[in-house]
Design a protein with these regions (language model features):
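Conserved acidic carboxylate
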Residues: 13
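Two-component/phosphorelay signaling modules centered on CheY-like receiver
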Residues: 16-36
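Acidic catalytic/metal-coordinating carboxylates
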Residues: 40-43, 66-69
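Conserved phosphotransfer cores of two-component systems
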Residues: 49-51, 73-80, 100
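Active-site residues of response regulator receiver
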Residues: 59, 86
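The feature encodes the CheY-like receiver
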Residues: 63
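C-terminal output helix
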Residues: 92, 110-123, 127
């Protein structure tokens, strides 16, 4: 029996320790494949074009382009769904991320199960998640 294809994920996080921890945690999830990990918004746009992920897990505060700018740029040139990851769940930040094209927004203290659930939902192109 052939297994279902993995969801290809690009991680965008400027905190190297957090980025590596996310990569390690997602690496144990059988149906998720981390295809790249970058530390700034501009690198995210370039990596998205090159790696063609299904889902981009996007930090809000980033160098070069912030998460809102990078999300908007990715949505203009890619079908990848963007799941935003933010340290604070400020209403203005959330509105800006959704307006830019994010399909879900999570806080950085979300559990692995919550993050994986959002990735799976985003990859199936479901309705926006709250």
């Amino acid at each position: 029996m052939e297994s279902a294809p993995s969801t290809r994920v690009l991680l965008v996080e400027d905190n190297e320790v957090f980025r590596e921890a996310l990569e390690l945690m997602l690496g144990i999830v059988p149906d998720v494949e981390v295809v790249g990990a970058v530390g700034d918004g501009l690198a995210a746009v370039h990596a998205c074009a090159k790696l063609r992920p299904d889902v981009v897990l996007m930090d809000y505060r980033l160098p070069e382009l912030d998460g809102v700018e990078a999300t908007a740029a990715i949505r203009e040139c890619s079908d990848a769904a963007v799941v935003a990851l933010t340290a604070t769940a400020d209403d203005a930040e959330l509105d800006a991320l959704y307006d830019a094209g994010a399909v879900a927004c999570l806080t950085k203290d979300s559990s692995l199960e919550e993050i994986v659930g959002a990735i799976r939902s985003a990859s199936s192109r479901g309705a926006s998640l709250v």
